[in-house]
Amino acid sequence: MEKLEMIYEGKAKKVYRTDNPDFYWVEYKDDATAFNGQKKGTIDNKGVVNNKVSAVFFKLMESKGITTHFVELVNDREMIVKALDIIKVEVVVRNIVAGTLAKRVGLPEGTILPKTVLEYYYKDDNLGDPLINASHIAALDLATPEQMAFIKETALKVNDIMREYLAPVNIDLIDYKLEFGLHKGQVLLGDEISPDTCRFWDKTTGEKLDKDRFRRDLGNVEGAYQEVLRRLTGEA
């Protein structure tokens, strides 16, 4: 497959056309942003880690019957994916209170939620990706009720799969963001699953192994990302 012109550059990835219109070529960047682009920086080899970690999780999902956009890794920093028409709803799944949820509901970070919380955000950088609900999604015609039912069911399945997978490597899945899109009319799991889009805490120490180290100036961001990759793949 041949890599052609770039068609999109986001905060974390570049997307290129290929000589097959059904597939895109994705390059993961080292650029880091937080607070909807208000804070910017660079994390050495972040793109490499996120590419490889995403591949691990996408392959895991496929093995459990969840269809994703992932096709194959090209190299350390790039992968081939199915071309998606992105659904403009970001799905956040929360198991333990952290980040904005702590501020919104007044519970301390680290509080275990008795039930998994699902949140929907309108994927629009200009608006700051605001929190929305099912009524907003219907009114804005962002997705059909059937698509949202499938997305909700899939997001919860992903949660069960990831928590079970991460437990033996001593990682707690605090929360994470998923994106979905349409490929030939079918809803697929897209974007990435990485320390950029998930909160990973060490089960024993509570050490943060994700982008919160960048957001909160905790230091050793590169080391935390590499540690996640090491635990998942054994790769240093």
Swiss-Prot record:
InterPro entries to which the protein is assigned, alphabetical: SAICAR_synt/ADE2_N (IPR028923), SAICAR_synt_PurC (IPR033934), SAICAR_synth (IPR001636), SAICAR_synthetase (IPR050089), SAICAR_synthetase_CS (IPR018236)
What is the protein name stated in its UniProt record?
A: Phosphoribosylaminoimidazole-succinocarboxamide synthase
Could you tell me which PROSITE patterns the record lists for this protein? SAICAR_SYNTHETASE_1, SAICAR_SYNTHETASE_2
Gene3D superfamilies for the chain: ATP-grasp fold, B domain (3.30.470.20), Phosphorylase Kinase, domain 1 (3.30.200.20)
Give the pathway listed in the UniProt entry for this protein. Answer: Purine metabolism; IMP biosynthesis via de novo pathway; 5-amino-1-(5-phospho-D-ribosyl)imidazole-4-carboxamide from 5-amino-1-(5-phospho-D-ribosyl)imidazole-4-carboxylate: step 1/2
Provide the reaction this enzyme catalyses.
5-amino-1-(5-phospho-D-ribosyl)imidazole-4-carboxylate + L-aspartate + ATP = (2S)-2-[5-amino-1-(5-phospho-beta-D-ribosyl)imidazole-4-carboxamido]succinate + ADP + phosphate + 2 H(+)
**What's the top EC group for this one?**
ligase
Q: Which GO terms describe its biological process?
A: 'de novo' IMP biosynthetic process; cobalamin biosynthetic process
Pfam families referenced in this protein's UniProt entry, alphabetically: SAICAR_synt (PF01259)
Molecular-function GO term, any one? ATP binding
Entry annotated with the keyword Nucleotide-binding: yes
Species of provenance = Desulforamulus reducens (strain ATCC BAA-1160 / DSM 100696 / MI-1)
Per its UniProt entry, which superkingdom is the organism in? Bacteria
- Sorted UniProt keywords: ATP-binding, Ligase, Nucleotide-binding, Purine biosynthesis
Family annotation (HAMAP family) = SAICAR_synth (MF_00137)
The protein's matches in SUPFAM superfamilies, at most eight in alphabetical order, are given as:
SAICAR synthase-like
What's its EC? 6.3.2.6
Q: Which family does it belong to?
A: Belongs to the SAICAR synthetase family.
